[in-house]
């Protein structure tokens, strides 16, 4: 995948072959194997996430903290790490305090128990406001109910959405002083 990204990305994109976390070291990247082969979109270094898969490919990967990988100012961070969100965020506290970027975080309670609540609390403690988009409406994370917005019966076996069914797993977080509502409304 890294080679494909290098070949297809803009010249200013740097590809790092690492797993972000809250520590430096190594971790096992577990990639579930489906009937059609590897399900890369569900690969994770969170072992409990993929235990339900019949089989997994295991690859040892280096881990690093985002604070050590990116020292430049950044305006936007996207996190999609299949259950490892809180660890990545704890490894990015310096970047968050230094740059105060906007974050887009994918979090699902099916990947890690209370994943959404712990991510919401992490940002609340740092005076960030959070929002999600549901059926075209911008909604504060305080109104998020996983029982409604992350009903697993809305999902296909590969994690895709069933036609006509809503499932919310992307959340925007804005630092104090930045009007997230206005940004998302524009």
Description of each model-found segment:
Residues 1-186:
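Phosphate/nucleotide-binding beta-alpha loop and adjacent structural elements of enzyme active sites
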């Amino acid at each position: 995948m890294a080679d494909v990204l290098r070949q297809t990305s803009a010249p200013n994109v740097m590809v790092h072959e690492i797993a972000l976390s809250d520590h430096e070291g190594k971790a096992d990247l577990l990639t579930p194997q489906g009937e059609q082969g590897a399900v890369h979109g569900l690969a994770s270094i969170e072992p409990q996430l993929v235990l339900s898969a019949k089989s997994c490919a295991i690859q040892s990967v280096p881990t690093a903290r985002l604070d050590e990988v990116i020292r430049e100012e950044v305006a936007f961070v996207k996190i999609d790490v299949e259950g490892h969100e809180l660890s990545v965020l704890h490894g990015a506290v310096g970047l968050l305090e230094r740059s105060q970027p906007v974050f887009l975080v994918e979090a699902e309670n099916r990947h890690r128990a209370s994943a959404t609540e712990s991510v919401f609390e992490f940002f609340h403690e740092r005076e960030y406001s959070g929002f999600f988009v549901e059926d075209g409406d911008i909604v504060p994370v305080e109104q998020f109910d996983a029982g409604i917005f992350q009903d697993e019966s809305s999902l296909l076996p590969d994690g895709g959405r069933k036609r006509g069914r809503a499932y919310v797993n992307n959340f925007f977080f804005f630092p104090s002083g930045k009007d997230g509502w206005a940004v998302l409304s524009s």
